[in-house]
């Protein structure tokens, strides 16, 4: 693609990784005149090093992907709209087959999806949409909260459900504060009271232990914006840049690093019961070994899963030398040099943290994966790092603007999962903001030693 579009500067070694990440951010957008354009969601995403990706080259990238049978969900929507625009008969067939269409979670609908729905609704088919503007959290996937707020069809009727049968009065009060600029004000029909939500000041591991001690045997759902925070708690890993470690493996040590990463990914998928995905990852790990087929993939996965208790606490050096070296044409040990120093300082669990699991039953999840769920007790972990920006990260409490700021809606989703007890963890709190939070009369603030 870079060669065909004469963007040779993108092929420099230091740029390859960044280009790969940036291309994942392109999406089809609906313009005000109804036309479709392929572009980055943010203009700065075009920048790679000191250069910019040409906008008119993006369609060429898509064509290459399509020629290889690679379709993104976004492409499916784009092509669906194109098909409907070229053949009105298809819309007639859809109307005849679906006289009634009910769409849940409509606040997460993209502009393209909304346009398709409006075309179908022009006659015959009756459309019903259900949603909550406060829970529109998929802007990165093309969703627009304004599209939901302003959605209109001829003869539309509006119904509101303001009763909250899930949470205590104390938690509902927090939700109403965070969502105060929306049109929805919730209440508890049975006025069920409970504990005042707590803000825990300190590290995530201390906060988790504190919350677990409070809830006892009752389940504690731990949520965070980024997947590495709940994963670090799940695996007992301290604060390190796990994503940087992952990229180091994939791009700095060629085949060996990739093999280690994809084998670990395979094992973690296997633990989750996603055997099909686990086998795909194992095949990726040994892709250059032409004798390594699905049978070998399954055999290796089974062996490594059986050894999990012996693997999970190893450094990457020990994991590689003990369980990968000597098997399936892996001939070279890690014995010396800078790579040995690196692999000896990184542990299996550090990399396991980066594997994007789809666990729906896990008590350690990202906020986005908790949509639609509920739990007795919830611990929300706010970005917990040395560069913690208190003003930015606490704005959803100190100066909420839920319609304008998607981050505030994401945190609203997390808070609204809680039924009985709610904890919010932040690493630090200034005296000034402590006073402002106390004025809200919504939280108890606890400093963890």
Residue spans of the language-model regions?
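The feature marks helicase ATPase cores and/or their adjacent C-terminal helical subdomains
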Residues: 1-449
